[in-house]
Amino acid sequence: MNGLKSGKWDFDEEKANKAINFIENFCHHSEGRNDLLKLELWQKAIVSAIFGIMDKRTGYRQFREVFIVVARKNGKTLFAAAIAAYMAYIDGEYGAKVYFLAPKLDQADLVYDAFYQIVQADDELDSITKKRRSDIYIKEFNTSVKKIAFNSKKSDGFNPQMVVNDEMEAWQGDQGLKQYEVMTSALGARKQPLILSISTAGYINDGIYDELMRRSTSFLKGNSKETRILPFLYMIDNIEAWDDLEELKKSNPNLGVSVSEEFYIEQIEIAKASLSKKVEFLTKYCNICLLYTSPSP
């Protein structure tokens, strides 16, 4: 974070805590139970960086593109929906437009539905929200929350305060790259917009996932001049230790929280007996991007 070291950026603890407090006091689990969402330390770090690091010159948030790569079953859908809820209800942008984007409309349903379940579970949020046929509308702030599918030819009309891109590894080739460009180019009218991209690793090469990985890696190594991208890449360091639970905690920060250790032990044994299952385990639970024939038995 060279901007913090150089003094170009500030960390506003009050703004960071405001976002954390909203999520933990208004956002409920959407599956299995109705408890309030309790953020883990890694999630608090992400929320704090997004909403707490400010451009000292403008006073606005520093980061516009956030890229989170975390293994399957670590609660990323609900986490993304909770961040979107903060943007829709608390961020203070009148007339905000929040989009949940995926290649197909039914794929965008996952985070969109999690968002609406958060709203329904809280009487205060629900009382100022109307579910319409094409969107979720918050009259008090003139805010629209909508799910949309790929249409890279249509760029007019998008004026997003926030875009949530789910499972970026499934965004195919040029189509995914073009759609991402459409949404990023539409950010200009907002003072502090946010594109949140969440994913596990995948099998597709040369798509937007790979492009974001290249940019993110360069940023984290200090080799990039970019100042608006904020990556969080949770993956194992040692592929030879892929079956070690301590190593797996690096790609599964919620190990033992949202999923038990026993689940991973069972999946490891299945992977040891099947090359195809090992490839799937390495990509989806270790976040190592591989071709199908890459790993050795």
Residue ranges and their predicted role:
Residues 1-294:
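Phosphate/NTP-binding elements of NTP-utilizing enzymes
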